[in-house]
């Protein structure tokens, strides 16, 4: 079983503190985080847990859909996947992720729009990151290029 590691060093309180998220397994870098920028409309060169969740979901989903297209006898071609992860106040208190909008556009060969949409929906529930996010509503828009 593969294990991937990320580590965060945080300093200060929630409203004024800052942190750095390090992608340990890949060594691809360290990224700055802060709560005020996390909650703002403009990220201002700062990442957030929500952006990282979006990256995890969009990459996992594209791999899963590519595999399903191949199993169905198609050729994946290019898939462009975007995950928009919402973050805001929770009516019950604190903050939450109320939902994720997943958009996929592709140009697979050997599939019609109906089959592509069916496989896109299947990938939404079968990719490992989607499974980990079962407590969050994920909507999907799938279209052919």
Describe the function of each predicted region.
Residues 1-55, 59-145:
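Extended beta-strand/beta-hairpin segments
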């Amino acid at each position: 079983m593969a294990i991937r590691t990320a580590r965060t060093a945080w300093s200060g309180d929630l409203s004024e503190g800052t942190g750095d998220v390090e992608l340990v397994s890949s060594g691809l870098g360290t990224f700055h985080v802060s709560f005020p920028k996390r909650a703002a409309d403009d990220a201002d060169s700062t990442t957030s847990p929500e952006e990282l969740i979006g990256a995890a979901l969009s990459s996992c989903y594209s791999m899963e859909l590519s595999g399903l297209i191949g199993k169905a006898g198609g050729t994946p071609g290019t898939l462009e996947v975007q995950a928009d992860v919402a973050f805001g106040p929770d009516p019950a208190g604190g903050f939450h992720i109320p939902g994720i909008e997943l958009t996929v556009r592709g140009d697979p060969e050997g599939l019609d729009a109906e089959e592509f949409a069916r496989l896109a929906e299947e990938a939404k529930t079968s990719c490992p990151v989607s499974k980990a996010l079962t407590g969050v509503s994920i909507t999907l828009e799938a279209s052919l290029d």
